[in-house]
């Protein structure tokens, strides 16, 4: 068995304490608007989120970050960190990504310490960098010698699984339905990974305006169970 497998399983475990369970990234707005109310309506939204948001932001950034690490190009890592920060227009989602990224990075550096992870932690502490889970995941995975393709696919899977679990609580859905959604989304995640492999840096940030607007509107909802 490859040595990295158990580390990767821990990194992608839903109990890994990044705080992702507190963020819906606009999903809760659609729930309160009555657009998402069951398994089928969430599945439709989730496919759009993966294809229109996750692919062109986090997913692509994770791949580009890993490739930069292969070339020992830390300047590109810091540039991607800034691009991800600027690309998230909604304040809550921007802050949510920062918090999740910082927690993933801090815990990752405690479990799998490396000079690059420490450098990222230090830059965030100094306010030079912001922190983002896609960058942190790439850094940790590269330090553990997890292959690039496995890294990007795992990041997509983990991000999707977290959103599904939040849908289970927010809509709400049954736990069995949640697992069905995760299983049913696997082919779509594989398609998303294939698409990411064809993209360039010029494709970064092509995201759906409807999802971004729902993320902006979330902070003025009267009742909320999620932070974004």
Curated annotation (Swiss-Prot):
UniProt keyword list: Chaperone, Cytoplasm, Nickel insertion
InterPro entries: UreF, UreF_sf
Keyword set includes Acetylation: no
Pfam families, per database record: UreF
Coiled-coil region: none
Location, primary (coarse class): cytoplasm
Compartments where located: Cytoplasm
Annotated GO MF terms: nickel cation binding
Record carries keyword Chaperone: yes
Reported function: Required for maturation of urease via the functional incorporation of the urease nickel metallocenter.
Entry-linked PANTHER family: UREASE ACCESSORY PROTEIN F
Similarity annotation: Belongs to the UreF family.
Subunit structure: UreD, UreF and UreG form a complex that acts as a GTP-hydrolysis-dependent molecular chaperone, activating the urease apoprotein by helping to assemble the nickel containing metallocenter of UreC. The UreE protein probably delivers the nickel.
Name of the protein in its database record: Urease accessory protein UreF
Native source organism of the sequence: Lachnoclostridium phytofermentans (strain ATCC 700394 / DSM 18823 / ISDg) (Clostridium phytofermentans)
